[in-house]
Regions:
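Solvent-exposed interaction patches of small proteins and small membrane subunits
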Residues: 1-113
Length: 113
């Protein structure tokens, strides 16, 4: 399963986020937010692939939100609300040029996700 391998690699890279503490420079902020984004993207795509392989036809055209909800129903994940919060953070990556948004994403990644 290529998507699962990609997720594992992204997750291992994301662990580096704990090596950094504030104050962050711009490059560090951008890089840490990028690690979160890459890991989240690979996680929902791996879930999608697993759901498809398990016979969930609706997963074939599902959005990340739909995949998360289906994964929860399939007991693939335990905390639907936390995953949906992570999706909101991923959607906020587009606004990570705002330092406060970037810091929120980094904090949530370290403390919640």
């Amino acid at each position: 399963m290529k998507k699962y391998e990609n997720f594992c690699n992204a997750f291992n890279n994301l662990k580096d986020i704990y090596d950094y503490e504030e104050p962050f420079g711009n490059v560090e902020l951008t890089g840490l937010v990028g690690l979160f984004e890459a890991c989240f993207e690979q996680s929902w795509k791996a879930m999608k692939e697993l759901l498809e392989q398990s016979g969930y036809d609706s997963a074939q055209t599902g959005s990340p939100r739909h995949i998360i909800k289906t994964a929860y129903q399939a007991t693939m994940i335990d905390d639907e609300e936390l995953w949906l919060a992570a999706l909101v953070s991923r959607n906020n990556v587009a606004h990570a040029y705002n330092k406060d948004v970037a810091l929120d994403i980094i904090y949530d990644t370290k403390e919640k996700y």
